[in-house]
Amino acid sequence: MASSLCASSAIAAISSPSFLGGKKLRLKKKLTVPAVSRPDASVRAVAADPDRPIWFPGSTPPEWLDGSLPGDFGFDPLGLSSDPDSLKWNVQAEIVHCRWAMLGAAGIFIPEFLTKIGILNTPSWYTAGEQEYFTDKTTLFVVELILIGWAEGRRWADIIKPGSVNTDPVFPNNKLTGTDVGYPGGLWFDPLGWGSGSPAKLKELRTKEIKNGRLAMLAVMGAWFQHIYTGTGPIDNLFAHLADPGHATIFAAFTPK
């Protein structure tokens, strides 16, 4: 399962108060659904806090965002998650995007930094696809498509029917029990057993994951735009700014030379 942080409160969990006339009344009926249709049952056991942090102080969060979901700061100005099924999907979509973004951010910043200080010698993340590897790009793409497709297919099946993929396809005796959708746990995904704590502690850890994931999504997007306008990576830009903070700034990219 690129959270949303300095930015965490700004991009908090996808969900929203509807400010379009008539929409709110129409959606109230849709909210009368059993609680089991909402994801992360074990986390939702924590009662909603009326004094919980809100993305904008003084604002009223929508009914479908009661604070029981990790990373929920009552932000959904377009009502994208007003429908229970949409909320369920958006929760899982955000989790997986957060995790990919965190991996992506690590893949951008760490190799570039280690190359900058002379420990590694790797190409820029922006041009990594142009390099020659142990086989051709078509083979790499097909293998990646098969592996990722298999993993995403099982994730999709778990969303549709929670618990349906808890049995190891290779070793049927290995089974997971009591896991929430998007949080498989077990030896591979929770080797330290952090997911076995109290509901309050579990929600705290999941909220931290969402926040870091949202920050990572912003960081990856920032690195992308930065390379478009400067032609260099974030670490190179950082070192250049530290060496000449008066001139090496974001504004220099838009200044005619």
UniProtKB/Swiss-Prot annotation:
- Which is a GO BP term held by this UniProt record? response to low light intensity stimulus
The residue span given for the transit peptide is: 1-43
- Transmembrane domains' residue ranges: 100-120, 133-153, 215-235
Which amino acids does the record list as binding chlorophyll b 4? Answer: R155
The subcellular localization recorded is: Plastid, Chloroplast thylakoid membrane
Superkingdom, taxonomy of origin: Eukaryota
**Residues binding chlorophyll b 2:** R99
| Residues binding chlorophyll a 3 | E209
Q: What is its induction? A: Induced by low light (LL) but repressed by high light (HL). Inhibited by cold.
> Where do the annotations place chlorophyll a 1 binding?
F75, S81, E94, R214
Query: Which post-translational modifications are recorded for this protein?
Result: Photoregulated by reversible phosphorylation of its threonine residues.
Q: How is the co-factor bound, per the entry?
A: Binds at least 14 chlorophylls (8 Chl-a and 6 Chl-b) and carotenoids such as lutein and neoxanthin.
Task: Spell out the GO cellular component terms annotated for this protein, sorted alphabetically and separated by semicolons.
Answer: chloroplast; chloroplast thylakoid; chloroplast thylakoid membrane; cytosol; photosystem I; thylakoid
The record lists chlorophyll a 5 as bound by K208, Q226
Which residues take part in binding chlorophyll a 4?
N212
Q: Which residues bind chlorophyll a 6?
A: H241
Supply the PANTHER family for this chain: CHLOROPHYLL A/B BINDING PROTEIN
Assembly, in brief, is: The LHC complex consists of chlorophyll a-b binding proteins. Red-emitting heterodimers with LHCA3 and LHCA5. Binds to carotenoids.
The free-text domain note is: The N-terminus of the protein extends into the stroma where it is involved with adhesion of granal membranes and post-translational modifications; both are believed to mediate the distribution of excitation energy between photosystems I and II.
Protein name in the entry: Photosystem I chlorophyll a/b-binding protein 2, chloroplastic
Q: Which organism is it from?
A: Arabidopsis thaliana (Mouse-ear cress)
Q: Which gene is the coding source of this polypeptide chain? A: LHCA2
